[in-house]
Amino acid sequence: LRQILTTKGNIDLKPTDIQDPEYFHKVVDCQYACPAHTPVPEYIRLIAEGKYTEAYMINWDSNVFPGVLGRTCDRPCEPACRRGRIDEEPVAICRLKRVAADNRDDVIPYMPQGPFTPNGKKVALIGAGPASLTVARDLSPLGYEVHLFDEQIKGGGFMRSQIPAFRLPEQVLDDEVDYILRLGIHTHFKHYVSSLKEILEQDYDAVFVGTGAPRGRDLPDLPGRQEGDANIHIGINWLGSVAFEHTDKIGKTVIVLGGGNTAMDCCRTARRLGGEDVKVIVRSPFASMKASPWEKEDAMHEDIPIIDNHVPKSFVIENGKLAGMTFEKVEAKYDANGKRSLVPTGEPDVFYPADDVLIAVGQENSFPWIERDCGVEFDNWEMPVVDKVSFQSTHPKVFFGGDAAFGPENVITAVAHGHQAAVSIDLLCNGKDVKTERLSPFVNLHSMKMGIHEWAYDSTIDEYDRLAVPQAPKEFTLKDRKKEVELGFDPLAGYKEAERCLNCDVQTVFDAPKCIECDACVDICPTSCITFTADGEEADIRQRTKVPALNLKQDIYVADGLKTGRVMVKD
């Protein structure tokens, strides 16, 4: 529903159109917050029922990599979870996804079965990361001849090169990449594409660029950078070197610069490769770091201190070799508009010793292989000009997605880009407009009457606190960089955590002619989400609900036609 306001005296809400799937799409907050719109409550119910294979396939249809994302997702669904509004913690949606992945049966019989009838169209995918693999997964069953190019020996992109094996076991990634490649994808691994023009000359009907943001930012102007180069490493390059087993050790004293998830992966990997005194040093305050809270917690659990409010001043070189770094202490100051500045405290600079330094201060895109006269326009920041709906560039046959489109994001965003780009490519190849003829996000609507014994759950709110995911002892995991730290929920814990879900996708609808306004539904509702109230302006109604409905982005359900003239409102 798009809330429709009228202007007849008061600004009253019109009744919700329950035939419009947009309302039911938006009201399931976790699903709406997921970039790939994974139907979260649906698969959580299946997990509670022990139907892990079905739960896995629900995920695979939307997010393509349930096993990967069940371990590594940035979890945009969890801040949106309604459970977090009545408890301190939302449902552990991400880790429940892993429960389905870890306990599934053979899922190949439930996947598209080739060979597929060719439709005569050919598509090139540059880069074999999550965005490109999603495009391949979506287009191949439609009969497209899909060619996948990557300079690495396997598919996976940054999921393979930048996410350490102690967070994402290689076998988990291999399995989910192979599910896609078995759909008849023509792979060209160990093949670096050096010219987009050459690709376009090969009669592809469309080209998708999913090459990520492969260039880590450096600190080239910091004094001592060149002299200490042998022991100063770019974080993402170093992680890739470790992943492909070109690097297997590091010095005992390590400084990691940066406050994002890459910095957390670098410091934890360094601990496993011989780093005994590893510390993260970041410019910003601890609370403002870009790293996910759980990533920071995991690093500190492994005895890695995070030193905030320190700006790097120089690399210190002694006898021609890196000896450490100096830092200036700063504090965050905010102006009237909330803009932050880092202001020196005036204290003396601080020296920290280091055998090695890992720089993880950000990533940049790099497209040296795309000729600037091939029809793809670039902006002032050397980023391709890409439409945010269709993911089409200024060259009608060339599409971008993942980090290559708008800069560094995460796996689930790359998957979402891949889905949308695949839709656009299919529209283009069928002679349709890539923007005006695309459909809204798909929503499953099932209308049913349910007796009390048909509910999969009881009607009360289970009082379980959010369960912590068990971890292997660090005295073992720190000795082996491939030893997975998180053990995942067992089936019983998965069931208990699944029962914390409020089933927001199960939507009651009101039948006003049958309502006698006894308010029994209000009294029995465990979440206090139903209100009978006088009609009026939307802002006023939102304040009058039993729990004020203050999230203006979230539509409220409204039904009228009661004999008293009141309206039924559900948030």
Where are these regions (language model features)?
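Glycine-rich dinucleotide-binding loop and its adjacent helix/turn
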Residues: 100-117, 175-197, 216-273, 378-394, ...
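Rossmann-like dinucleotide-binding cores of NAD(P)H-dependent redox enzymes
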Residues: 145-183, 187-188, 240, 267-314, ...
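Iron-sulfur cluster-binding cysteine motifs and their immediate structural context
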Residues: 1-9, 28-49, 70-100, 147, ...
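N-terminal Rossmann-like FAD-binding beta1-loop-alpha1 element of flavoenzymes
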Residues: 122-146, 262-271
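FAD-site-proximal beta/loop scaffold in flavoenzymes
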Residues: 227-251, 335-408, 534
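A conserved FAD-binding loop/helix module that cradles the flavin
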Residues: 266, 404-429
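Feature captures the FAD/FMN-dependent oxidoreductase FAD-binding
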Residues: 47, 117, 122-126, 174-220, ...
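Ferredoxin-like iron-sulfur electron-transfer modules
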Residues: 13-33, 56-75, 108-124, 160-161, ...
